[in-house]
Each structure stands twice: as structure tokens, then as C-alpha cells.
Amino acid sequence: MELDECLERLYKAQLLPEVTVRALCFKLKEMLVKESNVIHIQTPVTVVGDMHGQFHDMLEIFQIGGPVPDTNYLFLGDYVDRGLYSVETIMLLIVLKLRYPSRIHLLRGNHESRQITQSYGFYTECLNKYGGNSRVWQYLTDIFDYLVLCCIIDDEIFCVHGGLSPNVQTIDQIKIIDRFREIPHDGAMADLVWSDPEENNNPTLDHPDNSGQHFQVSPRGAGYTFGRSVVEKFLRMNDMNRIYRAHQLCNEGYQIYFDGLVTTVWSAPNYCYRCGNKASILELYSKDQFYFNVFEEAPENKLLKENSMNDNALEDSISNPVANRKLIADYFEDDSASADGSTDPEMYIFSDVYQARSASNRHVDYFL
């Protein structure tokens, strides 16, 4: 099947045959293996945050931000899980990358992981859509191992899914990471996709710990939280001026930290079809000219919830019943959770960490 024919089908949310998925994944591996852990691109570019299988919202992005290849896009990761159309979402991005390799750039997020996707929807979705076998999931999660970790725009803007790491002081240290594997539980690679900036909630983040670093172990169970001093040091050492990242739900679609040194971009509106948040894409015209294009959910999502599914069925579809569905429901009943969109701890993948922390803190999340 030709790439343009694949695109025509995918834009209509039609599944591709398994044999085609396999062939496309093989071609993309051949392309991605040639890319460095850190890619360099130039403005103008539009930066996209978490999508989480919200396929119709991704189509909305191509409407408001411009179609490919007219617009140059950088996606910051987390393409799958939670939304009902993770397969269609990642497949469209794969084919667009193959068709327009210089106009679509894909970073790896913490959900581009075999372990995570077995618990938070993507694995089950692949089984349901491809006759109960896991081969398509295997093809796609193999692709995840080839996705790049970071991007630098105009030699001055550092882009990553999550955040910084106490194991990384320079860009050169990122370039030598062995990325062609499952995301480990700890270390530099894990930190890049799991860590978060934290501005107001913990002032001790700007004071060094015993090792002389300005990091604290993240409540997510992986990665770290880090303060302004970490950001300033990293930017100074690498001659950068700011950081763009995703990974955290923002009620207004984006959030700015440390007087503009760090910006979070969130691109999944009404996350999980019920959070009510806005989303944004960051249109970067030059290093000093940019615009947050804020948008709301696509009409198809409203129809999906109103006409196709009741709340229980929707919840069944966006979460693996084995993966603490009751806790997810409890989260949504807690009106105080993420009220300002700035704090949203993960539902911890490491069960022992999760059990200890959830017992003392009901403010759990649905795995961003």
C-alpha cells in the first residue's frame, strides 16, 4: 500500500491491515536508526504536547496549525494510552514521518513504553482492533525504542518530553545514551521522559541536597522534580535560553515556569474526555516570536461521549480494568485534584512505591 493511500485511510480513522503496519514500522526503523538522540531543527516550527490517543483532536491540530507538509511539526511524545484511538494516532504520525521526514519530528515520551502501555490502554486497544493478537502492539512498541529523546531548535531551545536529570549536565551526555531499548526505571533516559519542573510547591528544590544537586525524587515514582537553579545551570552550560516540554496536564493548555525559562505544552483537550481542560500548540516563528494557539476538543469527542458510550463504558475503554480503575474513578470524583493544572502526580507504575504513597495521598493521577 502506497503512503498516500495509507494517509487517505488514516485521515478517515480507518485501520491499516496488519501486514501494512508491519511494513511501515520496518521502514520507519530504518529511518529513525540514522537519527541522533538529539536532533536539530530550525524555525518556523509548531510544538505539540501530549496527545494520548485523542485522534480527532490531532486532526483539529492539523486544521488550526496547518496541514503537513505546509507546517513543520515537533511532537513531544505520549502519543498513546488513555484515548480511544491510540492506534490511529500513532499510525498517522508514522506514515506522516515516512512521507514527509523533514516536516514531522517525533520525540519519545514516558508512555512510549511496553510496560506502561500494557496497563494504560494501548495494549488492550491493539488486541481489540486486531483480532485479539498482540503483533501490532509489538510492531509499534518496537518503534518506540527508535524515537529520539530530545530536540534543539535554532541551537538555543531545548525540547524534551519530561525534564532534566541529575545524570545529565550537557547535551553531549544525552547523545551517548543507548536509547534503542525499553525505558529503564531510573537513570538519564528515564529522567528525560519522567521529570517535572516545580516552581511553588517545594522551595527546598532550589537548595542543594547532600550530593550538591538541586533535584528531589519525583512523587510519580520515576524521575525527579527540579527547580529554577537546575534550569539556569543547564541552560548556561549548554548555551541555551529556554526549555519546551510536555508531560503535565495544564488547564489552560500551557504553563510557564521560572519567568519563561521552562514552558509546558499540553495538546489533549478535555483529557480522558472528561477533565474539561483546554489544549494548545506552540507556534514558534523565530526564537523570539511565538504564539500559544489554544483550542478545545473536537466535536467528534463530544458526540462520542454523548451518543456512543455511557460513562462506565467510556472508562472501560480508556483504562485497563486491571490497572486500578477504581482509583481513576476516585480521582475524577475529587474536585480538588489538579485544580490549577500545575500538579498532577502519576499513578505510580512501581507498585510498592504506589501503594506506599497512595495510602497517604489520595491525589493520584491517571498516568500522564
From Swiss-Prot:
Q: Which Pfam families match?
A: Metallophos
Q: Where does Mn(2+) 2 bind?
A: D78, N110, H161, H247
> Where does the sequence pass through the membrane?
none
Give the reaction(s) catalysed.
O-phospho-L-seryl-[protein] + H2O = L-seryl-[protein] + phosphate; O-phospho-L-threonyl-[protein] + H2O = L-threonyl-[protein] + phosphate
Q: Which GO terms describe its biological process?
A: asymmetric protein localization to old mitotic spindle pole body; glycogen metabolic process; negative regulation of mitophagy
PROSITE patterns (alphabetical): SER_THR_PHOSPHATASE (PS00125)
Co-factor: note: Binds 2 manganese ions per subunit.
Database matches in InterPro entries: Calcineurin-like_PHP_ApaH, Metallo-depent_PP-like, PPA2-like, Ser/Thr-sp_prot-phosphatase
Please tell me one Gene Ontology term that the record gives under cellular component. Answer: cytoplasm
Annotated residues that bind Mn(2+) 1 are located at: D50, H52, D78
What family, per the record?
Answer: Belongs to the PPP phosphatase family. PP-2A subfamily.
* Cofactor(s) it depends on: Mn(2+)
Q: What class of enzyme is it?
A: hydrolase
Give the signal peptide as a residue range, or say none if absent: none
Other comment: Present with 1960 molecules/cell in log phase SD medium.
Q: What is this protein called?
A: Serine/threonine-protein phosphatase PP2A-like PPG1
What is known about its processing and modification? Reversibly methyl esterified on Leu-368 by leucine carboxyl methyltransferase 1 (PPM1) and protein phosphatase methylesterase 1 (PPE1). Carboxyl methylation influences the affinity of the catalytic subunit for the different regulatory subunits, thereby modulating the PP2A holoenzyme's substrate specificity, enzyme activity and cellular localization.
UniProt-listed Enzyme Commission number(s): 3.1.3.16
Q: How does it assemble?
A: Inactivated in a complex with phosphatase methylesterase PPE1 (PP2Ai). Interacts with phosphatase 2A activator RRD1, which can reactivate PP2Ai by dissociating the catalytic subunit from the complex. Interacts with TAP42.
> Catalytic positions?
H111 (proton donor)
Q: Which Gene3D superfamilies match?
A: 3.60.21.10
Function, as annotated: Involved in glycogen accumulation.
Q: Which UniProt keywords apply?
A: Hydrolase, Manganese, Metal-binding, Methylation, Protein phosphatase
Q: Which GO terms describe its molecular function?
A: metal ion binding; protein serine/threonine phosphatase activity
